[in-house]
Amino acid sequence: MTAVGSGTGLAATFATEVRTRLDRIATLAADGGLDEAITLLTEAIEAGAVIQAFGTGHSEAFAMEIAGRAGGLIPTTKIALRDLVLRGGYEVDTLGGSTMERNPNVAEDLWSVSTINPGDVFVIASNSGVNGSIVGMALLAKQHGHPVIAVTSLQHTRAVEPKHPSGQRLCDVADVVIDNLAPYGDATLALRQAHDAALTGGVPVGSVSSITSAFIAQLLTIGIAERIAATGAVPPLYLSANIPGGDEHNSGLERRYEGRIRRGT
């Protein structure tokens, strides 16, 4: 972490931390799994399959960047823990806190209420890469013959113990691993204050995994669209629903994937 004091320089320092990571992700695309993931996902879409995006906690934001948004690909589905409440008979209270995302046993139930077909590819995001539901879903996908792409912090996941009974991390299960370059603990800045004697390294602030993971999601989408367009085909992309003709455009393309994609909450 970068140690900083309070003041107006915090924004500039954080911007530097973010920019440095985004530049590295873009520069290392070929060696960091991004190009391999784009190839895998493009081939799946061209074969009529769907991208299954999954994340828990703040990593659900990654799945939201992949599935069902303006400028995003239409053959995508977001899997979320709340699906167990909406379709699996779980009580609403079970969503509180982090108990559910750490529970490896929910993966089977979540799989049973999801729309998954042969050939679909899973893209699973988890900064820590060790929670039970995340690793459990990755293992289930592999058991059913689906490729798995992981978006995770390699620095963080290698520094913590796995929580899944298998002893595996998300990066151990995945076919392709993309490092979101977040540091251990996610925060990039250590804010020094006179009253924080108990926190000798400073107060951790300025988390970056959501930003870098969203960037990765967009690079994946752009790369897939570019590959499809290069063949002369029109990439199946959403328009904003809040522009004239957006709903009609989107509905028409969604009908091609009827029964294979699901737009949830």
Please provide the spans of the model-predicted regions:
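Generic N-terminal amphipathic, Lys/Arg-enriched alpha-helix
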Residues: M1-L28
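Amphipathic, non-membrane alpha-helical segments in soluble helical-bundle scaffolds
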Residues: V4, T8-A11, D31, I38, ...
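Active-site phosphate/pyrophosphate-binding segments
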Residues: A70-G72, I224-T265
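A short, well-structured juxtamembrane/interface segment
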Residues: A26-E46
